[in-house]
A protein has these predicted regions:
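Solvent-exposed, non-transmembrane regions of membrane-associated and secreted proteins
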Residues: 1-170
């Protein structure tokens, strides 16, 4: 067994075989990728066990980096999508999200692709928001118009700091 590649990929999101990934692990709902970053990973969803993939790899084995996963409050049938991933010191998972605090980087890397069995959904990054776990950001974003993809990772020196990359469906 090899874990889905943590390396950047040049292939477009349409080349990921989502049904084959789901056949290996039924918790997989799609593939997230951002060109020009190392972010290219399967995305998991386990509403009854929200943090299952926090420290577990695609194959269910222990992994410090886990696998990006969809918030248990989210549904693929509509509404906002919130995906969590670790900010790993080795440059994997969502570590590249911290580069979005630089406005030039944000402007040059605005397109986020999320491929599911329904096809490729494209989102355009609109904001990088520094916040914390106690902030009411979820309610604010949930109230905004249009469907959004929010990528969330740890940020800063405290354990409660978060960086949110907010992208609007295009």
């Amino acid at each position: 067994e090899t874990e889905p590649s943590a390396e950047p990929t040049e292939q477009s999101a349409t080349e990921h075989n989502i049904p084959a990934l789901i056949a290996v692990n039924g918790d997989c709902i799609g593939w997230l990728s951002i060109d020009g970053t190392s972010i290219s990973y399967p995305v998991m969803h386990t509403p009854s066990d929200p943090q299952k993939y926090l420290r577990q790899n695609f194959y269910g084995k222990y992994s410090q980096s886990g696998v990006p996963f969809l918030d248990s409050r989210c549904s693929m049938n509509g509404g906002n999508l919130i995906i969590y991933g670790h900010n790993m010191k080795n440059g994997t998972m969502f570590s590249d999200l911290k580069r979005y605090v630089d406005r030039d980087f944000l402007n040059a890397h605005r397109t986020v692709k999320f491929e599911t069995t329904d096809g490729v959904q494209t989102f355009i990054v609109t904001e990088a928001l520094k916040t914390n776990t106690s902030d009411a950001w979820y309610d604010r974003i949930a109230a905004e118009d249009g469907r959004q993809l929010i990528l969330s990772t740890c940020y800063g020196s405290g354990k409660d700091g978060r960086l949110l990359i907010i992208a609007a469906e295009s």
